[in-house]
Each structure stands twice: as structure tokens, then as C-alpha cells.
Amino acid sequence: MKGLLQRVRNARVEVGGEVVGAIDQGILVLVGIEPQDTRASADKLLHKLLNYRVFSDADGKMNLSLREVGGGLLLVSQFTLAADTKSGLRAGFSKAAAPALGAELFDYLLSQARIAHTAVAAGQFGADMQVHLINDGPVTFLFDT
């Protein structure tokens, strides 16, 4: 399971012109699910997302986690993170999970996030989404569990 974390001042996801998820300061995470991923992969990714130190402390060092600052978590499914881009000029998606598995694991990740953290929002799995964000830094990390 891949998670592309971006520290944001704010972010929102729209589907069909309607906002389906929004946060203020926090992290936007694009989630790519692969065939070998399991609930354990989702648990490991969630632990990283909530505890990875991406926010600045009083000395300006990235020493604080999402939990510590009480920021928002916006999860957005993005199967293109699992793309094979090594050859040619067109991405291959055979390394992406089938939609049923992807939906199941994304829903699991989202439900666990809502149990573990108070400010959680999400995009809509499989939808054509427009993601708006103000990247803070920019600070971006790619996790691969």
C-alpha cells in the first residue's frame, strides 16, 4: 500500500461539484492499493500517517506528528500510484488492486482512521474527483508498506 503524504494548510475533495471531504491544517494522503495489500498494510500505513513527524515545533524542526498538532487527515484513493512507469510512454495498471479489493481496503483504512483520530475526511472511492489543496512547505513523503 502506498501513501503519498502532503502537508497542507487546507484541502478539499469535490465530486460532481460537491465537496465530499475537507480539512484545515493537516495532511492530505493519496492512497494507492496493490494486489498484495492486506488490512495489516493499512494498519501500518495509518500508524505512519498519524505519528510521522511532519509539523514544526517551536524551534522550526519537523518534530510534531498529526496527532500532536490535532490536524486533519484527508484520505483520497488514487490507483495511479500503483502504476508501472518503467518502460514506454504509457502507464500500466496491472500492479493496482482490483476495484473490489481496493474499495474494501480503502474503507477499512478510513474506518480505522476515524477510530484513531478525530478529524478525518475522505474522497469517494472510484469517483472522478477534483482535489484542491494549499501545500504547506511543500512537505511531501511517499510511504510504501
Curated annotation (Swiss-Prot):
GO CC term, one of those recorded: cytoplasm
One Pfam family it belongs to: Tyr_Deacylase
Cell location: Cytoplasm
Motif (Gly-cisPro motif, important for rejection of L-amino acids): 137-138
Biological processes per GO annotation: D-amino acid catabolic process
Keywords: Cytoplasm, Hydrolase, RNA-binding, tRNA-binding
Database matches in Gene3D superfamilies: D-tyrosyl-tRNA(Tyr) deacylase
Organism domain of life: Bacteria
Major location category of this protein: cytoplasm
EC number in record: 3.1.1.96
Subunit structure: Homodimer.
Annotated function: An aminoacyl-tRNA editing enzyme that deacylates mischarged D-aminoacyl-tRNAs. Also deacylates mischarged glycyl-tRNA(Ala), protecting cells against glycine mischarging by AlaRS. Acts via tRNA-based rather than protein-based catalysis; rejects L-amino acids rather than detecting D-amino acids in the active site. By recycling D-aminoacyl-tRNA to D-amino acids and free tRNA molecules, this enzyme counteracts the toxicity associated with the formation of D-aminoacyl-tRNA entities in vivo and helps enforce protein L-homochirality.
Domain characteristics, as noted in the entry: A Gly-cisPro motif from one monomer fits into the active site of the other monomer to allow specific chiral rejection of L-amino acids.
Similarity section: Belongs to the DTD family.
The protein, known as: D-aminoacyl-tRNA deacylase
